[in-house]
Amino acid sequence: MGLALQHSHRWDLSPREAANLQTRLRPLVLAEDALPDEIRTVAGVDVGFEDHGRITRAAVAVLDFPSLRPSDQAIVRRPTRFPYVPGLLSFRELPALLEALERLNLLPGLILVDGHGYAHPRRFGIACHLGVLTGIPTIGVGKTRLVGTHGELAEDRGSWIPLIDGDETVGAVVRTRRGVQPVYVSVGHRLSLPTAVDWVLRCTPRYRLPETTRQAHRLASA
């Protein structure tokens, strides 16, 4: 199924130009619920690197919802064109991920991104970037904290507390499984933070990470 981008831009940018573009695109993020009436598929995206970082390997894993059974996948390899710069992950990874999405038979109703969304120094992480370009609802699910501070989180599965940066709530610290480290959830595009947390928990029935992320990581690192 063809991927019709809602917005597009050049990718051959310097790190300074890329950071400025994030600031310009940030107002396009919709941090309120605008999901499809029914979500039948959810996807995870992840990226690995081959040949000492010279090749980007992007993977998309699509799962039926609510069964979370794999239904489609795509893997793309292409030369890495952008350096590793903290906070500019999307410029290194998104060109290959967009190509992988283009190869799917059917676009997913929701994408969980292995990375951050609004919980980002310029409030425009890779989950926001992907959502704004494609128009698909997206959630950032980070394994580590990029910005912000938080209080003590209860041990029970489903517990969550705000992630605060300055005077702003930028995400949520979420316990997806009792006795394991939390994940850092943030809005990507077209949903609110409570809804993002709810969907992450729905997609994380057994392990610390969502099943979408686990399947995409398996493809990206195989």
UniProtKB/Swiss-Prot annotation:
Keywords: Cytoplasm, DNA damage, DNA repair, Endonuclease, Hydrolase, Magnesium, Metal-binding, Nuclease. GO terms for molecular function: deoxyribonuclease V activity; magnesium ion binding; RNA endonuclease activity, producing 5'-phosphomonoesters; single-stranded RNA binding. It holds the Pfam family Endonuclease_5. The record marks 84 as: Interaction with target DNA. One of its GO terms (biological process) is DNA repair. Its main location: cytoplasm. It is found in: Cytoplasm. GO terms for cellular component: cytoplasm. Its cofactor is Mg(2+). It comes from the Bacteria. CDD domains: Endonuclease_V. Its EC number is 3.1.21.7. It catalyses: Endonucleolytic cleavage at apurinic or apyrimidinic sites to products with a 5'-phosphate. InterPro entries: Endonuclease-V. Mg(2+) binds at residues 46, 114. Disulfide bonds: none annotated. DNA repair enzyme involved in the repair of deaminated bases. Selectively cleaves double-stranded DNA at the second phosphodiester bond 3' to a deoxyinosine leaving behind the intact lesion on the nicked DNA. NCBIfam families: PRK11617.1 (NF008629). Belongs to the endonuclease V family. This is Endonuclease V.
